[in-house]
């Protein structure tokens, strides 16, 4: 099973867009401020948090005027102010009230012996249907329409109106989830975010990976990944993983015992000094110390990655940024795979966002990045639980875009109304199959790619 498309409404530049996803890799291309980060962020908000929250500023710009006009429309009618809105009025106004919405279309194989975590989302009665919709919406809580609209609000001053609206959105808006029959949009079933997260695991490799400045607190991101590996491996039920964890804990216990023995001996030497101050006195017990070591804290706080070089271990920050970037991406993928294998049986969806993987990579490495990513994924998938992640990669690299071809590229454009338009090159060039090779060559313009060849100079 896999996600075939995502529809997003009213989130920042993504006022009303649909993004088709490939089964394996989709590449997002576009200028700065074209909505690429907004895509990642709305997925992170809904599927990466236990309790999604949004602010007025997260709504698309055109929503501000919709809010204002709706308040004008309701408050202009004095009868509505004096009498609470009934159920039919709530339905009428709710349809016009802006809400941030994410719709995921899932495609599945109907011949599967069981649908696992997908089962609650399949609500149609059509034996030939192999799709279902999952809708997650951040909107006005049901039953709160009177409190949201009928309390006093200043419509004369737009600044004061926005300030009050911001408070009301925070107070009265909430997240709802439901499954929807793609053949009958009125057929719905309310579910929870917990149901969605059982089905879909979402992970992110952010653009800012803390590699650039050795003076920052983020100077050893590779070492910090070890803590994540330990946490994930600890939850694994596989015998090999449990054996590894036990060996780590045994090693730490051995060190802990040795330290405690040394501390006890040194403590005895302090007793004469303490006795001068009357300790321990009558009715006062003596004391002893015990050192307790935590494997997790040792890995996160006291473990550092070094690179052997001519007998000297160089710290992590001494390696090139491009190399560290690749290592970090690969280690994070391995961590995501371990988490997926621990929590799932291979019947779930794994969506992984990678932002700007080209950072610090030379053109040749950018050109082969997608291919290497696929090979690394295949290698990890062969280690146990079936694993077919869906990658969404946002990039400014023409080399990465050129390597994947039109089928995988979605181009983000911002129009004059400050809205994002998504150009699906797979669809746009579907009528030009015979000329696709020529068009691809025409759009490929590279120069000086030989400069970084190892033996050129």
Model regions: which residues?
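Conserved H-loop
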Residues: 389, 395-397
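Pre-Walker A-like glycine/lysine-rich segment at the N-terminus of P-loop NTPase domains
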Residues: 1-48, 55-76
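Extended helical coiled-coil dimerization/tether regions that scaffold
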Residues: 199, 207, 211-354, 375, ...
